[in-house]
């Protein structure tokens, strides 16, 4: 039971929360939206982040032996909430129920069916009106810079001589997301 649930009680975790933790552990850099009936729910730290970001009421999921923070959004309003979260820079893992509840033998099976990030959107309802670039930066003999709009397939790439030219291009294209080469991720002066 990870600390991410921020729960209290002697345990054990109820099966629903065990399933949540198993999926959440596979996508540690994402906010997991976990379908429970007509809602996408978050638990623990994710619930606190969701409630804070969207101004939602933070409640608690309580079972006989365990209590954890909980917040959720109605599935019917998913596009509007997802758009807001993506604009704030969140990466979303969407876990849907993949079998009807009435046909489930025990716990309803859930699987992550979508991974959404600001730069990889293809859903028409979530796309911004302007280009939605995913940028990638690498170093070598200068600065390698590539832009991809996955919704249209547009691709641009260039090699730049200076860091200021790199920043100028980033400012001009305003990417929704930037991927850094490993050596740049560890360079605090760059990030």
Regions found by a protein language model. Name each.
Residues 1-191:
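Basic, polar low-complexity surface loops/patches
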């Amino acid at each position: 039971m990870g600390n991410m649930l921020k729960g209290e009680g002697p345990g054990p975790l109820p099966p629903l929360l065990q399933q949540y933790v198993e999926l959440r552990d596979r996508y540690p850099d994402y906010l997991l939206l976990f379908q429970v009936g007509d809602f996408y729910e978050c638990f623990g730290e994710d619930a606190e982040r969701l409630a804070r970001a969207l101004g939602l009421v933070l409640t608690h999921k309580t079972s006989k032996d365990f209590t954890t923070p909980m917040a959720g959004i109605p599935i019917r309003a998913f596009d509007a909430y997802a758009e807001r979260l993506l604009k704030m820079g969140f990466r979303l893992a969407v876990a849907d129920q993949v079998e009807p509840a009435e046909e489930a033998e025990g716990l309803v099976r859930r699987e992550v069916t979508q991974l959404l990030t600001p730069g990889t959107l293809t859903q028409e309802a979530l796309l911004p009106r302007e280009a939605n670039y995913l940028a990638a930066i690498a170093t070598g003999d200068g600065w390698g810079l590539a832009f991809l709009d996955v919704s249209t397939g547009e691709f641009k790439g260039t090699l730049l001589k200076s860091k200021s030219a790199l920043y100028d291009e980033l400012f001009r294209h305003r990417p929704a997301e930037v991927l850094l080469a490993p050596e740049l991720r560890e360079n605090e002066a760059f990030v």
